[in-house]
């Protein structure tokens, strides 16, 4: 990223992908009048990113202006965002319908646009992916009109062809980062065979009762615990059992 190359980062969850683009984007915005556009496929993800950026901004007293620009953005706030946002978080639909067609109003933003961050790129496949690729072509043409050539930083969950997928979206060579350098704690894999409760009939204890038993032991040992079930009903049943167990204790 620091070399100015288009980059796609494909590493596991909680491996620090967000920092891969947040640090260079924030550093560039602080050094000079540099803008960044973040694109997320859903409003929920966009709101989460804005919350993290605002927290970082407050903690470091950075003075950066970070805003969401989506369908819920009030009309009176849109002009201020166009003129003053350093980091703008949006989605492909808004870029297509509300930003690019009115690029003359966004001239100041596009002139200084240095980074375009696209998260969750594994979701952009099929027709949706084709639409995004065309929108990005339009974005690059508009940026070229204003004398800007933004660098693309893409992030994805694990996929088989990150480099080819990213290059198809941005139509340019992309460097793929596929190895995580994040520290990983020691792991133990245990396969649990429920005990036999009726030898004559060959019946074993239910998976539900054993899941509750194991989860109870783990929680009492202050271990972070996730229990995956095959259905929502099973999740609700196990949650109910665990609540009853701990309420009694």
Name every feature range the model reports, one short phrase each.
Residues 45-70, 139, 168-174, 246:
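Conserved helix-turn-beta segment of the N-terminal RecA-like "Helicase ATP-binding" lobe
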Residues 35-49, 215-245:
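Conserved strand-helix element at the start of the C-terminal RecA-like helicase core
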Residues 10-15, 120-128, 136-165:
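Conserved helicase ATPase motor motifs in RecA-like P-loop NTPase domains
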Residues 71-114:
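Conserved helix/coil segment N-terminal to the catalytic DExD/H
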Residues 49-50, 98-103, 120-135, 238-239:
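Conserved ATPase-coupling elements of RecA-like P-loop NTPase cores
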Residues 66-78, 92-93, 180-181, 230-233:
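Conserved helicase motor
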Residues 151-155, 159, 163-235:
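Conserved interdomain linker/interface between the two RecA-like ATPase lobes of SF2 helicase motors
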Residues 2-6, 18-32, 137-142:
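Walker A/P-loop NTP-binding motif
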